[in-house]
Amino acid sequence: LWGTQLDFTGGLGNGFAYRFIYDKQEKDYWRNFGKVKNTTYAPSLSWENDKTKVLLSYEHKDILEPFDRGTNLLTATNALPDIPVSRRLDEPNNETTAKTDNIDFKIEHKLSDGWKLNAGYSYARYKYFYDQARITNVNVKTRTARREIEQQQGDQRVHSGTLNIVGEFGIGDIANRFVAGIDAMRNIRDLGPIYNKGITNSDINIDNPKYTSPVAAHKNGNGNAYQYNYLKTVGVYIQDTAYFTDNFIMTGGLRYEYFDQFAGRHCLNAANCKKGQNLTKTGNTDQHDGKLLYQLGAVYKFTPHIATFANYSESFRPQMSVATPVSGDLKPEQGKSFEIGAKYENSGFNATLALFNISKRNVAEAVGSGSNAQLNIVGKQRSRGVEFDLNGQITDSLSVAANYTYTKVKSLENELYPDAVNQQLSGVPKHQASLFLAYNVGEFDFGNIRVGGGARYLGSWHAYNSDYTKAYKLPHAVVYDAFIAYDTKISGKKVSFQLNGKNLTDKTYYPSTSGNATNTVSYTHLRAHETLMNL
């Protein structure tokens, strides 16, 4: 990998200042073909006086990366195909090209010594296009993989705005920080055209693949050539933080959230539209709802360095079906979370230990496949666990960053598939941990040198077939990384160089899966170095 980062900041006079960030990264993909390229331009302009601050920023990204779904789990044997993990069975033109644009405008105005007004607007757009040879079956006896040749593009735009007032005042001996506001969002997502039914039997030899970069025929026969999801939300909220003493703090809040949503799909054209499919925008999801949500928290400091905390919050998330019909009333997903913990912090060190419990109901799941696919409310899920984080200086030269997470997340109810009840959810390891050390070698005439390294642990986890009657275990892995960094000045400008070594032992590991009938397994086998220069 090679990359260049530039960051310029300066004043323009009369309260104005500017900043410009440029970042370019490029590397070869770790498997047998593919490139990863990312370029970012981010200018911003700010202005302020003694009462008002204004910030206008823009960010543009150009993205090119492989569209690699990994490999397919052979569900009959609970194994992966017996080929090198670096060998791809799709095509060199399996790439995603994308552009993102983000605009942010923020104003902060001081109304008085204790009150201020904040307002903001943001716009985000994400456009992408990809070609794909989707692997639908791997036959180890005939040594072939079957693919469907597909093509897709999409465009998503998000408008959001916020307005709030913040005040600090006292009620008797109790200091308060009060916030009240409103926010609104409009999310417009359009996918299509999607071509996925022209070439469905593109076979390739898994031992000696011949890549031809086929392009999808402009056909679609399953009524999902165009998919859309239009979501509007409005939230009104109040929150107060009360400082009863120097040691005891409580916060409480209310939020009312409302949404209106329309989503669905339709055919490519009349010639591709079959009976029962939509030729125009007739939604599978057309709903609106609202809910009052509660939040409560408390902090108690035993000493200036040791504190305990507790938090309770509720969530409300609209669901939608784009590509599949809806089974009955698609109720919004609702959740409740509770966290308690302890924290230690001083000028150079902090550590946090927390216990959490998250419960969700009205959990939706797509079941079936093809024309029989349907979105259903299947029941309840619960996540419980422990988190530990530690960061800080062991000595003046040696620092540490460590964390550990234990997560037990399972289905409590599943009306369609009772075998899913009490099973650890797919793709969620119970144990994850990391430990990294960094050492400042010291200042020299030519600059400063830092070195460091550590390990990441990803625990084993399971994937399931469509009715949860079979479980496939993915193994745990320990991955080692290291770096060396050099900081200096060139012509009075700070410059840093860093060499990163990732996965030093060349370990194959599996970060995720997708699907539940013929599981696609994303895996990593990357031993790489990265050279970065920051200005």
Which role fits each region the language model picked out?
Residues K106-Q132, K301, T308-F309, K331-D396, ...:
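Membrane-embedded beta-barrel scaffold of Gram-negative outer-membrane proteins
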Residues G154, F178, F338, L425-R527:
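Conserved C-terminal beta-signal and adjacent last beta-strands/turns
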Residues H525, E530-L535:
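Single conserved hydrophobic/aromatic residue that forms the stacking wall/gate
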